[in-house]
Amino acid sequence: MKGTDVGADLLWHPRPALTIGGGLWHLDQRTGSGDDPRYPSVEDVFDGATVAGFGADTNFLRAAARAELDLRDNPLHPHAGGRYEIHFSRYEDRDSGAFDFDRLEVDVQHYVPLPNRYRTLALHASGVFTDPSAGDQVPFQQQPTLGGSHALRGFREFRFRDLNSVLLQAEYRWEAWWALDGALFVDVGQVAPTRRAMTLSGMEATYGIGFRIHSNKAFVSRLDLAFSREGFLPLLRFEHVF
């Protein structure tokens, strides 16, 4: 996929912890055969004719609104408080009109300090819900995904994709040394064509142990050792999972 995005967001801070905003963007996207020899192209694995938006050039006008409340004690290395976000976007296909849709994103992070101040219970829940206009589709590259270093860590990047996704994560974090934290984590999540199609039995689960390097105020890197029904996956990253 190749393309360009041009636009602007306007943000308002009525209070230090509260952000309200919106924006207008033009998205020019082109999809086609992959050129990375390490991975098969989409049409080599799936029937390209059945993949929504494959091979189509789309020009979207995206109007968005968002609100965020950030009550974390330290945004770079939180131990208490939380961050709560909601985003709504409307995508208008300016070419064929075949890919008009709405997208709602909800993200909740909450941190519970345990009696020993060197331990924290970190909780995260997120959902992405897309709703195409009557007779339209959501292009595959705009559909929510699960898998990879931030969501269902025991599965490869983009392992699951559909019109709707839900993700729940929990981490028990403790300070092993002044610059090193340990973490036990569990991720569960699901993608589905409709919200009603989501079921508890359809949830995928991953679990594992992680190690995080940090300074007194900032996060530096993490190593997560994740397990799922598809095997073991080590993940070295330089940004926090949440």
What are the roles of these predicted feature ranges?
Residues 1-59, 64, 146, 159-162, ...:
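Gram-negative/organellar outer-membrane beta-barrel architecture
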Residues 9-13, 23, 66-70, 109-113, ...:
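Transmembrane beta-barrel domains of outer membrane proteins
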Residues 16-20, 74-76, 115-119, 178-182, ...:
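Repeated loop/turn-to-beta-strand initiation elements of outer-membrane beta-barrel proteins
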Residues 20, 29-35, 74-76, 95-98, ...:
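Outer-membrane beta-barrel proteins
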Residues 46-56, 60-177, 192:
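C-terminal outer-membrane beta-barrel translocator/porin domains of Gram-negative envelope proteins
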Residues 171-204:
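C-terminal hydrophobic structural anchor segments
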